[in-house]
């Protein structure tokens, strides 16, 4: 059988441990001063330590790698080879080594090298050289197709546009992460203030409990009044636990954005870092809306991304039109022999080649695709301008409404406090009962909570407005 004394002590110890754990969250430590956590510190952490943003920055490195890869089409090429006749009337051997350089203009290339033959080869064999071999120098130039543009240059041009496209992608991520961090920060601040209000409401009920107990002892109040106040204390303790959980959840969410500069680990901000109040909330300037819409149209990444994508498609369009043309290539090659005089020491050869697919379906299909995609993106660009203007107007409207709500909730707090003080005086005079005062206290608490939420909503709306106007865009990502 379990010892009731030990059981009672264990229960007391467990309650004491739970109370200590609860107090560590509810009661801020005052043994040392802690610097309040302000929004700029969180935003700086996002730009320097937030992993998704750091991952977005790598997009520029990826684009740089693709541009370098496209440049590889213009690398200097070393070609070498040889041949021999293991059987037959002729037993000659030939070998060659050349360097070929593609040109970055007009689709041509130049080449030069050396070749040599030995053994017995017929005079008509073009691979036959003198004893000491011969030097080779030549070039090839397209006259129509692949002149103004070819696949190599198209890939390079598009890779360079991809480098520029990385900036709108990074900027979009930057604006989204800054907005999310801002909303998370003010959600954390609002939850902390709501927790403080819940604790204040609990303290009022606890302070009144001893006074009611004294009144019951003197016979001035019925015992049921004390029971009712104890019930009120318990219900308000439950509200504190709920508010504490909400604060912990917002602190954990904020820690994803707020990280240690030493090891990049998330920082779960304690109550001691809560600022004393929300920042000032000035009324939005109605004269700025037109200028901000124009600014957003310039700096928002959506339009820039569409414009650069259209440029890439125009390169595809040019390439498709190029592929409709026939191949007419000309080339000149000069050979300078050394040594034996039995063959002509200097030889110059000119070539011309014509080639064209008769149906040209591949080029026509590519052209149709590029033109259709350009037309689609032109419509997207027009709508993007409208969407940006609508985003700015909607965010501004939300900010105006939040500011108006702030004024109304502050008035609501003032009136609720006035009614609560009047009801408290009436209770002292015996003109009302405890229930009426509890209702007034709850109304004041609800009014204060509404005011806290209104302040958080104002700064959330402000964060959305700044994102809509690209106000927090880094200069390095703007064109």
Predicted features by range, described:
Residues 1-33:
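Intrinsic disorder/low-complexity segments
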Residues 419-453, 459:
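C-terminal structured "cap/appendage" subdomains that terminate the fold
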Residues 32-94, 139-154, 158-160, 168, ...:
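Bacterial Sec-pathway N-terminal export signals of envelope proteins
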Residues 167-292, 398, 402, 425, ...:
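Periplasmic alpha-helical coiled-coil/stalk elements that build and connect Gram-negative outer-membrane
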Residues 457-479:
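Gram-negative outer-membrane assembly/targeting C-terminal domains
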Residues 54-58, 62, 71-72, 104-130, ...:
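Sec/SRP-type N-terminal targeting helices
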Residues 34, 81-141, 273-286, 317-318, ...:
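Small/polar, glycine/serine/threonine/aspartate-rich low-complexity segments that form flexible
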